[in-house]
């Protein structure tokens, strides 16, 4: 790799905001928040969805309530 053209690649801790689970990995992402992990301090990056909470990886299905949208459409435009 050419020196001086790549972003800083360092260890960071990602936290899933849904489950609260944290994991240590390497990233170019930075944060002012930090967390202690096994006696060392690392930047903390929060993510709404990770493999720990994503429906594809967990096998859980989330039902999307589209019935409310259909009823709203029918009230507004009626049935023809």
UniProtKB/Swiss-Prot annotation:
Keywords: Ribonucleoprotein, Ribosomal protein. One of its GO terms (cellular component) is ribonucleoprotein complex. It holds the Pfam family Ribosomal_L31. GO terms for biological process: translation. It comes from the Bacteria. GO terms for molecular function: structural constituent of ribosome. Belongs to the bacterial ribosomal protein bL31 family. Type B subfamily. Part of the 50S ribosomal subunit. This is Large ribosomal subunit protein bL31B. It comes from Mycobacteroides abscessus (strain ATCC 19977 / DSM 44196 / CCUG 20993 / CIP 104536 / JCM 13569 / NCTC 13031 / TMC 1543 / L948) (Mycobacterium abscessus).
């Amino acid at each position: 790799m050419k020196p001086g053209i790549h972003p800083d690649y360092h260890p960071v801790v990602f936290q899933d905001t849904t489950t609260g689970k944290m994991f240590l990995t390497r990233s170019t992402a930075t944060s002012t928040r930090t967390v202690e992990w096994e006696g060392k301090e690392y930047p903390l990056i929060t993510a709404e969805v990770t493999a720990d909470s994503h429906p594809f990886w967990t096998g859980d299905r989330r039902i999307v309530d589209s019935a409310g949208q259909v009823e709203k459409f029918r009230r507004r435009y009626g049935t023809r």
